[in-house]
Amino acid sequence: MAPTFITLWIGNNDVLGYATSGGTSPAAPTSVGQFQQLYGGIVQGLQQYIAVSGAKVAVANIPSVTAIPFFTTVGSQIAAGLPWAQLPLGFVYQKAGESGIGSGSASQSNMASGQILVTLRGSSYASLIGQPTGKFYKDNKFPALPAGIDTTKPFGVHPQNPFPNAFVLDADEIATAQNTVASYNAHIASLANANGYALVDINTAFNTYRQNDLDGTIVNGITFKTTYVSGGLFSLDGVHPTSQAHGIIANEFIKAINAKFGAKIQPIDVSAIPGSLYFQGKVSYKNGYPIIPKEVLDNVLF
């Protein structure tokens, strides 16, 4: 092949694995230094090819974890559904590094505002909050309960039976993910500017959709939100874009390419792409929470 135009969108999984595991992944986000080295190597290869081909390049940056429904769905439902006046400690969870007694405690406003995020994997357990249960430990085949855990205590509202760390991004973990994304994106922007590439700002685009969730954002007559399934932007795993959202992303590329290189590529009519409303009726709910079988999200990074 001898391409005359190259697009590059890479780096999402360097932070997503850490975030989707609730910060418990054995691999922390790819360090900024290593990311810079790896991304720089890709750009070096591109520059070598550009030198002999004259090809043009567009690169895209990385969206925030706080803009996708894998992280924003369950916490807001917990905020709306718990009898907060009856919970002196609020929502009790394990902070980063904890596997036994949980020292984290969140109020209704903490949950509603996204200061604490509960992953979509935690949805099936959210319906059990307040019950004396050890379902999490049974489902995950713990040989014995961690020290300090007492499953006769009400789940998710007592320090001795806290909501598991694997399903929660606490304030420190959110900061780690956000700071990592910001550093990655700064490096991507720097290399794009230095080498004359078009920069596609997917981060700002997704954040804008998230900020407009109350009324939604209208594209080609269709209203889009970042809400799980019904919003039309994200697929059933809460991470990957729908077909129509890929059209929206393509238009972001087109906009950046036209602006940078003076091209006249016409935008895609997103309404001509089949939507995903069919799937809205295919998600089961319990007490308002989507029930997601564990194995469904095992390969969320692919």
State each model region's role.
Residues 4-9, 16-17, 56-61, 198-201, ...:
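Structural recognition of the beta-strand scaffold that forms the well-ordered cores
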Residues 41-59, 180-200:
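A structural motif corresponding to the C-terminal end of an alpha-helix
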Residues 14, 34-45, 172, 176-179, ...:
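Extracytoplasmic/secreted proteins, especially bacterial periplasmic and envelope-associated proteins
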Residues 72-179, 186-239:
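Mobile gating loops/cap/lid regions near enzyme active sites that modulate substrate access
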Residues 1, 5-9, 17, 31-41, ...:
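Mature extracellular "passenger" or substrate-interacting domains of secreted, surface-exposed proteins
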Residues 224-275:
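Histidine-centered active-site loop/cap adjacent to the catalytic His
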Residues 1-44, 64-66, 71, 270-300:
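Conserved SGNH/GDSL esterase-like catalytic core that processes O-acyl groups on lipids
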